[in-house]
């Protein structure tokens, strides 16, 4: 939330957070305290219904277990209107490994959740989990680890087509690392049923916590404002590239995230 709220706000959209948990620090740190809010989510939703609350957009991110995924589906079904823009970031794993929260039940509930969305933002690992589950994800990951850059990009395009067909959504597959002529790049693939679009930039540094949250927040606010997905992805890539560069220059620990605050003003649509 500390990444999402400032991004959504500076883009001119009011953020109304429904916490699933309050943490002392993100889960990449060796020690953290987590106060689970699952049993209080219904109370908050009930109060919002009394207010006749109907958001213009709904964005779901990290969910700690299958019960929270159920609550997220319930939230969408309670508050979504015909014109409500829904984005789901199906947080389950990265780099061919599931996160500790992962269970097959969570994955099945996440499949239900993404069917409520207009746009989803999985990385390759999460795309494979949505399509195949844990066992086949690992098999596929071993296979793609041997691919050249061109083979990997072709494979991701196939996965993107499968996602859009199976879940009837627009899928943005994020954080695809590859090499071309000795240079390192990171790409994002926008997958619609009729077309696919690549947005690519040179890669700098390693993996930083919170970049996926920032990326999805820019897309979700853009959806509410009627911005084309490709334009929002390019905006997110430009923003993240600058924050990552500063984090590398300053030697910021990956668990601290990137240095994005300086560039928040660039997300605002100044009139």
Regions inferred by a protein language model and the residue ranges of each:
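Conserved N-terminal subdomain of the carbohydrate kinase-like
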Residues: 1-88, 92-100, 261-268
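Short beta-strands and strand-loop turn motifs
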Residues: 57-61, 87-95, 121-129, 173-174, ...
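Conserved phosphate/ATP/ADP-binding segment of small-molecule kinases
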Residues: 101-197
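Short pre-catalytic strand/loop immediately N-terminal to key active-site residues, enriched for Gly-Thr
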Residues: 196-210
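Short, small-residue alpha-helix embedded
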Residues: 206-229, 233
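Charged C-terminal helix
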Residues: 230-271
């Amino acid at each position: 939330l500390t990444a999402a709220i400032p991004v959504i706000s500076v883009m001119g959209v009011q953020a109304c957070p429904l916490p699933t948990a309050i943490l002392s620090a993100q889960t990449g740190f060796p020690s953290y305290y987590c106060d689970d809010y699952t049993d209080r989510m219904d109370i908050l939703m009930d109060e919002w219904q009394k207010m006749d609350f109907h958001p213009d957009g709904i964005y779901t991110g990290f969910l700690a277990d299958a019960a929270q995924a159920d609550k997220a589906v319930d939230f969408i079904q309670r508050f979504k209107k015909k014109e409500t823009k829904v984005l789901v970031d199906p947080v389950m794993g990265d780099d061919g490994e599931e996160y500790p929260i992962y269970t097959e039940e969570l994955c099945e509930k996440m499949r239900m959740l993404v069917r409520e969305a207009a746009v989803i933002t999985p990385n390759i690992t999460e795309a494979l989990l949505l399509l195949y589950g844990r066992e086949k994800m690992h098999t596929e990951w071993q296979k793609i680890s041997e691919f050249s850059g061109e083979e990997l990009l072709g494979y991701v395009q196939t996965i993107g087509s499968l996602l859009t067909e199976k879940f009837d959504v627009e899928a943005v597959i994020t954080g695809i690392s590859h090499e071309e002529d000795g240079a390192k790049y990171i790409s994002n693939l926008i997958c619609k049923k009729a077309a696919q679009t690549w947005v690519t930039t040179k890669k700098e540094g390693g993996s930083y916590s919170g970049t996926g949250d920032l990326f999805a927040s820019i897309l979700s606010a853009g959806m509410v404002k009627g911005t084309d997905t490709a334009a929002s992805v390019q905006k997110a890539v430009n923003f993240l590239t600058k924050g990552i560069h500063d984090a590398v220059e300053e030697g910021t620990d990956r668990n601290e995230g990137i240095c994005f605050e300086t560039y928040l003003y660039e997300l605002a649509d100044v009139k």
